[in-house]
Amino acid sequence: MIKIDNLPNIFTKAMPVLQRLEDAGFEAYFVGGSVRDVLLDRHVHDIDITTSAYPEEVKELFEKSIDTGIKHGTVTVLYEGESYEITTFRTESGYQDFRRPDHVTFVQNLDEDLKRRDFTINALAMDIRGQIIDLFNGVEDLKKRVIRAVGNPETRFHEDALRMMRAVRFMSQLEFKLEEKTERAIKDNHELLKKISIERIREEFVKMGLGSHSRQAFQVFLDTQLSEDVPNFAGKKDLLSVYPKLQFSPTMETSLWSIIIILLKMPNESIGKFMRAWKNSNAMTEKVERIINLFDLISEHAPTDYELFQAGEETLINTIDVAHILGQPISSEALVDRYMALPIKKSSELAIDGRFLIEQGMRPGAKLGETLNNIRKLVVSSEIENTQEAIEVYLDELK
């Protein structure tokens, strides 16, 4: 049996929680992704605890708790400034919607609880002494760098079809391969993904797209036909098959969506609809639209100073990132140097505003807005100095 002696601080801080449960006569273990990650020597973001104690019994042991999912056996305990999700050992049955169990039964056996987990590498538990409980050879699969469903993969994917997306996501993040039967079960059941909300699919897709192994995972995403069951990807395998051949994997979400849109050869007027279909925020949609606009400009010609000003620093850096990933030859240093040399980089830096123009005798209205815009363009292109005096001279010449 494997024993881990030097546990990260996130575990040692939680030890008193397990100890209190054990002192009360219950079993308690760390479980799931945190155990997997500590075995892989990866950073552990948060921990989950599983116990033989029923939710009400957990609540009796700790002063502060929140009923986060008490119907399914989960209580969040607040202890020493940290929050811990503690879930009762359980079995699940009846998955009519392919998303969540119709029935949850609390059990007193860790083995039964681990059987319901998605993949062997996640069906690992660790006790307070650092001993690893591994019923399904998850440690061996970690060594082999393999993602294998617990038990029958068809059953696991019928229980929650999102697990198919989680499989390719873990491929990307952990740089693992899919076990043969697990991959075949995804290919045979990919249409079940249509039963899952876009929000849940999107979360897994983004994690897959930003993983270090995303190009390899994306190939499996295409080969298993999962791509046929997500918004706007059906019938687009030929266009999307460029993704696995990219020089680099994206590390920013804006780059991920921009690259997908460029590969799909999507007209600019369709971007908003596409992003909404994927349940992206308005802010994310706007950022991606700005990147695509500048990317198109750079692909056609060297952008003017004013076009660089309109794009802004964030959009410029993100667009250069997208071009770099796509292998698009652009003079990125020259573009950044030109942007940094602009007299102003945002409208608020202009020496005058609308009030100044009114003081000069202009009436509020469209003409004033047009004049202000022209002044901004002239300042950005260094045709007028960014001073009130120089702008006054320009206004006098207009009269």
Swiss-Prot record:
- Residue positions binding Mg(2+): D46, D48
Q: What are the binding positions for CTP in this chain?
A: G33, R36, R117, D160, R163, R166, R169
An annotated GO BP: tRNA 3'-terminal CCA addition
Q: Gene3D superfamilies under this entry?
A: 1.10.246.80, 1.20.58.560, Beta Polymerase, domain 2, cca-adding enzyme, domain 2
Supply the Pfam families for this chain. Answer: PolyA_pol, PolyA_pol_RNAbd, tRNA_NucTran2_2
A single GO molecular-function term is: tRNA binding
Q: Could you tell me which InterPro entries the record lists for this protein? A: Bact_CCA-adding_enz_type3_sf, CCA-adding_enz_C, CCA-adding_enz_firmicutes, NT_sf, PolA_pol_head_dom, PolyA_RNA-bd
- Report the protein's function: Catalyzes the addition and repair of the essential 3'-terminal CCA sequence in tRNAs without using a nucleic acid template. Adds these three nucleotides in the order of C, C, and A to the tRNA nucleotide-73, using CTP and ATP as substrates and producing inorganic pyrophosphate. tRNA 3'-terminal CCA addition is required both for tRNA processing and repair. Also involved in tRNA surveillance by mediating tandem CCA addition to generate a CCACCA at the 3' terminus of unstable tRNAs. While stable tRNAs receive only 3'-terminal CCA, unstable tRNAs are marked with CCACCA and rapidly degraded.
Identify the NCBIfam families for this entry: PRK13299.1 (NF009814)
Q: Which family does it belong to?
A: Belongs to the tRNA nucleotidyltransferase/poly(A) polymerase family. Bacterial CCA-adding enzyme type 3 subfamily.
What is the protein's given name?
CCA-adding enzyme
